[in-house]
Amino acid sequence: MSPPGSHACEPMGVASLKRISVLRWTVSVPVVAMIVLALSWGSHPATPLVIVIGAVLIGAVLGAVHHAEIVAHRVGEPFGSLVLAVAVTVIEVALIVTLMVSGGKDTATLARDTVFAAAMITCNGVIGLCLLLGALHRRVATFHAEGTGTALATVATLATLSLVLPNFTESRRGPEFSPGQLAFAAVASLALYGLFVFVQTVRHRDYFLPVTADGAVVDEEHAAPPTAREALTSLGLLLLALVAVVGLAKIESPAIEDGVDAAGLPQSAVGVVIALLVLLPETVAAARAARRDRVQTSLNLALGSAMASIGLTIPAIAVASIWLDGPLELGLGATQIVLLAITVAVGVLTVVPGRATLQQGGVHLALFAAFLFLAASP
């Protein structure tokens, strides 16, 4: 006969081992990434080393998001979603700027392509997946129409100001802003994003908290938050991982462009690759929240990432353009504008009721599939 309590102790031991393995992995990856960065900086690695560096880069991205999640858990919702969104945006800006520095005039549309891809991935891919998971879990996914509608309206306004208007201004020929117009778009984007942060975290915080099937607000999590020491440690490792991502992205940038060319894809696919790489960990986090019946948290992550991608990336690129050579084309093409317009229209119809079924999730995923197909075959 087994000793009393032996079966009860086994799950706890397994859980402890899993936690230790996760802790070791998340602590070691940022350190290893910095070592790899120091050893490979300024070199032109061969193909096998490029693959290794790429794997380390992906690990650094995953590690950064993991530590951002720990910090986010410490500060609670909806602040946590903001921490994740800003961390992901820092990685995105780093990848864009490093590729633009190395690519010159050939990367004039890289910022536009990446930001638009991030908007399509989050507003269609991530939202569609999370609505699907939420509806499968509870037949009907519920969320706050007020908070989600505010976020969607902000994303639509930011996208129009930064990605659509450049096609219709007259100061510059082509889909470009003049320096003054670019400065206005950057300031307006920052102001809108800052206002949304205030609304989400202070003025109407309850609009962004998860809700139950009957509309009751869920203002607490079952898991105990990390200690202040754990949160500070994760903050330090997060900064370390972000530095590693910036440096490794610069080393990997020629390989990314060569891979896109070898696959016969258009140059705009580079932006899609960057957005997919950067948003993959956050997509997993949003899907996990949806499976835990926290669809509102998933929507906060998705729309918050889209908003940060436009509202923070465009100002950062505007500042970086002072030192970058070549033009900065932000205006979308006709096909992309159509996709953006239908995404906003479908998003409004999805958000207004505050409830969504499998059908709404399927519609968003169909739009995401159309975006991917047209990105590969314009």
Predicted regions and their residues:
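Hydrophobic alpha-helical segments, chiefly the membrane-spanning helices
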Residues: 2-378
